[in-house]
Amino acid sequence: MSRYGLQKLYINGAYTDSTSGDTFDAVNPANGECIAQLQAANAQDVDKAVAAAKQGQPVWAAMTAMERSRILRRAVDILRDRNDELAAIETADTGKPLSETRSVDIVTGADVLEYYAGLIPALEGQQIPLRGSAFVYTRREPLGVVAGIGAWNYPLQIALWKSAPALAAGNAMIFKPSEVTSLTALKLAGIYTEAGLPAGVFNVLTGSGDQVGQMLTEHPGIAKVSFTGGIASGKKVMANAAGSTLKDVTMELGGKSPLIIFADADLDKAADIAMMANFYSSGQVCTNGTRVFVPQALQAAFEQKIVERVKRIHIGDPSDERTNFGPLVSFQHRDSVMRYIDSGKREGATLLIGGYSLTEGALAHGAYVAPTVFTHCRDDMQIVREEIFGPVMSILSYQSEEEVIRRANDTEYGLAAGVVTQDLNRAHRVIHQLQAGICWINTWGESAPEMPVGGYKHSGVGRENGISTLEHYTQIKSIQVELGSFNSVF
């Protein structure tokens, strides 16, 4: 018997057997252990979930703003009470260190839910005077039933980032977590029901993106799809959503973000920022600053500071409190990252440290790749052009501000960017020229609930978090009122 046993779908306020009875395994990437069996949804299950959502959504939307706010706030309290329990599940499912999941993943997800719970009463329309006898008023109304499709790197946090604004606006959601890391989304569904969310308002369907995800994006009963994942999958989701019923979409896709260090920067601070921008969550963060641009004159000194810091990383069992760097999410992904590392070696980048998977000792049975740093990289190298989604830093040298801005923008991606400098005039001047939706000055990675996040170019469509996201989960109804007489031309 696996640690977490058989996991069912969540439809209409209850854990429910899938129609097909098919299952797939959840595997702990730290040791290869099967920790759960998950049921796979099929077309009949999708129809059931949509029907339940259509029934529950009007009940939810009819509640007062304060009633909805209180229910979501209760869910926040439950999440915080069960923080350690959920963190342990997340660590077993993703391989992320417990020190990370316990302090970040559940905490920040709950923060976003609390933020939107507080915004519900602020969802207001406008009153627009036309003339003495006439005016227009607007209402922000929910879209109805929306779908969320999550990625594997922040399973619970992403489920909350998508469900919080959707539910706050009065919608129902059908959420499909990544088939690689599905466990905590199923726990979240039960928490929502326990908090008082009406049956059918939040459903979870587990299974593959090619099957369950595609069925959701094409289903005529769904009004919007919010997707987090890679560019190729995002384009497919967007095409299916538009080709079926002109669904609205939000896309949070990949990145190959530049981190620019200027000559006046504190090099120790710059090295610390570069480490967090590359090796947090074992490098599996879409906003990571994996293209690190350093002035040519400072390159050697910067490299030395990076190598010193990489040597201090504690790679180990994710359940060990001392560990701050765990395995990659799966053995398949480990092999993908290693192919990129091999490509960097072949194309002539200089390997400073790392560059191998751990195949001996206590961690040999896990999907571990050592933190890896390449230098003397070129813009045309595969490791510089493509998103690796792993612990691989590429250091590139530059000589002028104009040059580094041009090179930083020379990518199909536009998710994030950052600068490290003591000159705030330069910081703002450069940031305003970088083609990226999320930018940091003298820091990296923090995404507060109040901060809209999303990408330029191929890195996304729409935004998550912040007040503006509520606009993406509502539609405006305009009503004109005439208080005086009406004159017909007929």
Swiss-Prot record:
Keywords: Metal-binding, NAD, NADP, Oxidation, Oxidoreductase, Potassium
Residues where NAD(+) binds: 150-152, 176-179, 230-233, 254, 286, 387
Entry EC no(s): 1.2.1.8
Transmembrane segments: none
One MF term in the entry's GO annotations: metal ion binding
Cysteines engaged in disulfide bonds, as pairs: none
HAMAP family the record matches: BADH (MF_00804)
Name of the molecule in the record: Betaine aldehyde dehydrogenase
